[in-house]
Amino acid sequence: MTRSKRIYVLDTNILMHDPTALFKFEEHDVFIPMMVLEELDNGKKGHSESSRNARQVSRFINELIESHGSSDISEGITLIQPKGLNLRAAGTVGKLHFQLKQTEPGKRFGSVLPDNLILGSILQLKEDNPGVPVVLVSKDINLRI
């Protein structure tokens, strides 16, 4: 059975629980909605473990962008593990993608809430990538429903 390439959409709570989650999806691509970046930015203040993890995710993303160079990020950034982080054997790696288009969740979900913005970005991602499985990774049971 061949495994097709998938796109994993990471929710804020996954990254605030484990900042290395970015690098744990092998050859598959990872997508981070704009709302997740905003929630990480809001969550980085403080001394709690989740605040430290939010800051670490930001450092990982910054390092990836800097190593990517000045070329266009719209095609994705190769998910090369940072130095000192040994999570998997060498092999094919996916790319990190960011939400580049604004969605209008009010048209689909009514209220403009963070979860609705994330769901709107997932639906847009599915429309933009027909035939590619898109998987939400979240600890939020209601969001997964």
PLM segments and residue spans:
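Active-site-proximal, substrate-binding regions of enzyme catalytic domains
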Residues: 7-135, 141-145
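Non-catalytic pre-domain segments flanking phosphatase-related domains
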Residues: 1-5
